Regions:
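Short beta-strand element of Class I
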Residues: 31, 104-107
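Short, glycine-/aromatic-enriched active-site segment of Class I SAM-dependent methyltransferases
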Residues: 181-198
Length: 268
């Protein structure tokens, strides 16, 4: 049986108006192939596969924007008139959300290539820094020090990224970091298919990230959970940090309460 790229087939079947839109739907996890979710736009599938688009149309180029949107709402973050950095930009869901919330410039930084959505690539407010490892970025590479940075990275611990981010931010800078237990816990604590389900491991991971952040001089300002799971089904958490002022600690009891609510909400 002949195979086609999923984004092409979705467009040919009239389920998306363009390949760019098809890619966004696929990467948002909204496309089922023979009732199985596929989230890789370049995946090849049988030409006679039954495709179905599910869920509501996203307000951002990817569902990553929903994560940042929750952080903005939960913590009252204001991005109007600010310069921001989207670290681990990928398709640009966070970047899109930043722009829609008034950011005047966004540095979209990602080690990958060709992932950033076309509408963001062509937006004059976006500086596309693809093929760029955040650990190699220095302040002189940015025209303006970001006032805000989001961090959504994979296969690396936040304790390797936060030190670099601190050197890039303005003195009043803020950070919203996505804590992913599967990349923070040791391999022996990661379960089948790369999923960490144990709430105790989640609590420990969050506590250790907090210690690392505070050791760098960041001030914890808030903690909540992501409204959507990661691609493999991992629950993720949003940690809000400042460079000065604000709160001084997030107690173990608060961490436990956030983890419990996350599991109750997302795992039912």
């Amino acid at each position: 049986m002949k195979k086609e790229r999923l984004d092409v087939l979705l467009t040919v079947q009239g389920l998306a108006p363009s390949r760019e839109r098809a890619k966004r739907l696929i990467m948002a996890g909204q496309v089922l192939v023979n009732e199985q979710r596929v989230d890789k736009a370049g995946a090849t599938v049988p030409a006679d596969a039954v495709l179905r688009v599910v869920g509501e149309d996203l307000p951002y180029v990817s569902r990553g924007g929903l994560k940042l949107a929750k952080g903005i709402a939960a913590f009252g973050i204001c991005l109007a008139g600010r310069t921001a950095a989207d670290i681990g930009a990928s398709t640009g869901g966070f970047t899109d959300c930043m722009l829609q919330n008034g950011a005047v410039k966004v540095y979209a930084i990602d080690v990958g290539y060709g992932q950033l959505d076309w509408k963001l690539r062509t937006d004059a407010r976006v500086v596309n820094m693809e093929r760029t490892n955040i650990r190699k970025v220095t302040p002189d590479m940015l025209d303006h020090a970001p006032d805000f940075a989001s961090i959504d990275v994979a296969f690396i611990s936040l304790d390797k990224v936060l030190p670099v981010v601190r050197t890039l931010l303005s003195p009043e800078g803020e950070v919203l970091a996505l804590i992913k237990p599967q990349f923070e816990a040791g391999k022996d604590r990661v379960g089948k298919n790369g999923v960490v389900r144990d709430p105790a491991v989640h609590e420990d991971v969050i506590a250790r990230v907090l210690v690392a952040a505070e050791g760098l001089g960041f001030v914890p300002r808030g903690l909540t959970f992501s409204p959507v799971k990661g691609p493999k089904g991992n629950i993720e958490y949003l940690l809000y940090l400042g460079m000065q002022g604000g709160r001084t600690a997030i107690a173990d009891e608060e961490i436990a309460a956030v983890v419990e609510e996350a599991h109750r909400t997302l795992d039912g």
